[in-house]
Curated annotation (Swiss-Prot):
Quaternary structure annotation from Swiss-Prot or TrEMBL: Forms a symmetric tunnel-fold (T-fold) homodecamer of two head-to-head facing pentameric subunits, with 10 active sites at the intermonomer interfaces.
Gene3D superfamilies membership: 3.30.1130.10
Name of the protein in question: Archaeosine synthase
Function: Is responsible for the final step in the biosynthesis of archaeosine, a modified nucleoside present in the dihydrouridine loop (D-loop) of archaeal tRNA. Catalyzes the conversion of 7-cyano-7-deazaguanine (preQ0)-modified tRNA to archaeosine-tRNA, transforming a nitrile group to a formamidine group. Can use neither glutamine nor asparagine as amino donor in vitro, is only able to utilize free ammonium. However, the enzyme might function in vivo with a partner that serves to generate ammonium.
Record EC number: 2.6.1.-
Single GO term (MF): transferase activity
Family according to the record: Belongs to the archaeosine synthase type 2 family.
Residue positions of the active site: 21, 28
Length: 109
């Protein structure tokens, strides 16, 4: 966590990661996006990457991963709003899981 004297309106972080499907036991590659409204502190990029890398080799469904990552971000920076989106493809089907917490953020156009 990094303390900031001036908070931006919204922070959006994106990266890729891997986990293991608990059903098929195959490697699941995913793209993850985290959006949050900071409240005096922001998540260090290295800390975010470490959070995502913690799923490598771990058996977890994407639905659980999205909620787990949301809880980690909330614990780290206590944002009033956070949204985690996990995207992947499995047997030709695009899977997108969203976990949100807090009030509705302002609309960005």
């Amino acid at each position: 966590m990094l303390k900031v004297s001036k908070s931006p309106s919204l922070v959006r972080l994106k990266t890729r990661g891997e986990s293991v499907c608990p059903i098929s036991k195959t490697v699941d590659s995913f793209e993850v996006s985290v959006e949050y409204i900071p409240r005096g502190a922001v998540l260090a990029i290295e800390e975010f990457k470490k959070m995502v890398d913690s799923y490598r080799g771990r058996e977890i469904l994407h639905e659980e991963l999205a909620v787990d990552l949301l809880e980690k971000v909330k614990a780290a920076v206590n944002p009033p709003y956070v949204k985690v989106t996990v995207k992947s493809y499995y047997i030709g089907v695009e899977v997108e899981v969203v976990a949100e917490s807090g009030g509705v953020p302002p609309v960005y156009i």
